Amino acid sequence: MLEHGVMKIPGINNVGKTGQAGGETERIPSTEPLGSSAATSPAGPLGGLPARSSSISNTNRTGENPMITPIISSNLGLKHRVTLRKATLASLMQSLSGESSNRVMWNDRYDTLLIARDPREIKNAIEKSVTDFGGLENYKELTGGADPFALMTPVCGLSANNIFKLMTEKDVPIDPTSIEYLENTSFAEHVNTLDSHKNYVVIVNDGRLGHKFLIDLPALTQGPRTAYIIQSDLGGGALPAVRVEDWISRRGSDPVSLDELNQLLSKDFSKMPDDVQTRLLASILQIDKDPHKVDIKKLHLDGKLRFASHEYDFRQFQRNAQYVAGLG
């Protein structure tokens, strides 16, 4: 079926106009959240964390994944919390080179818990779709050459949606494409309403950039609140391409200025001089912080800016990440 000009293939992640898997076309400003469609692939049963199987790779005899830092009390010092956050994200990214972890993490079934996704069922759905299309060659021809069995490098919407789910879900599925986005609301004023003693993640759908990304706002322990960006980018717009693994490795634990974020996500951004716009984009969203790699001529300053925030429990985030990393 066609959705926003993209062929949707039941049961698996889909391929956008760019030829990238994920069913999303980047760099097209829209009033709808990127990745607004949910696939119809089957998923495992809903519920809490599934029992760990001895067949799951990367686990020790306790059933815990040794790559993940042990889950401990949330009453942590700032330095320790920063270290735990960095280790959790690094272990998650490392696991995505594994077939099962990759398929579970970058699936577009948003109506079930991410930790209820079953990699075997996802693979079976892929195989069925390939068969329905008359074989692998026919499938590739109809989807722009995409290999459905290859490890996925997610476009911005797919990575933002799924990491948002991973961070926020506990007992109830959260669909990032169905949540209420704030529009015509000051980002700076909204952040000021958030409880500084709680963790929040903000999902940003920026039509000016044709881009979707996350802002992680860990609980404040002392001093000014810290913000971190989590993103992938297909490229072709104002910013160059970047894989989510590379971003997490190099800048995922690099705090960004809330003052700069407030400027970037303000209505006044479109009125700022070109050099200021370039500097802000490079500082916040360019992996090298290099203004020469920002092309502001590709901005769509009349595009809509929308965002939504959600509280998360860091220990639950660790558990969810541990599930994905333990799949291998």
UniProtKB/Swiss-Prot annotation:
Catalysed reaction equations from the record: L-glutaminyl-[protein] + H2O = L-glutamyl-[protein] + NH4(+)
Keyword Isomerase: no
Active site positions, chain numbering: C156, H211, Q231
Residue ranges of the region described as Disordered: 1-68
Segments passing through the bilayer: none
A Gene Ontology molecular function term of the record: protein-glutamine glutaminase activity
Subcellular localization(s) per the UniProt record: Secreted; Host nucleus
Major site of localization recorded for this protein: secreted
Keyword terms: Host nucleus, Hydrolase, Secreted, Toxin, Virulence
GO biological-process terms attached to the record: symbiont-mediated perturbation of host cell cycle progression; symbiont-mediated suppression of host NF-kappaB cascade
Hydrolase keyword on record: yes
Entry-linked InterPro entries: Cif
GO cellular component: extracellular region; host cell nucleus
Function: Protein-glutamine deamidase effector that inhibits the host cell cycle and other key cellular processes such as the actin network and programmed-cell death. Acts by mediating the side chain deamidation of 'Gln-40' of host NEDD8, converting it to glutamate, thereby abolishing the activity of cullin-RING-based E3 ubiquitin-protein ligase complexes (CRL complexes). Inactivation of CRL complexes prevents ubiquitination and subsequent degradation of the cyclin-dependent kinase inhibitors CDKN1A/p21 and CDKN1B/p27, leading to G1 and G2 cell cycle arrests in host cells.
Family (UniProt): Belongs to the Cif family.
Name of the protein described by the UniProt record: Protein-glutamine deamidase Cif
Native source organism of the sequence: Burkholderia pseudomallei (strain K96243)
Gene: cif
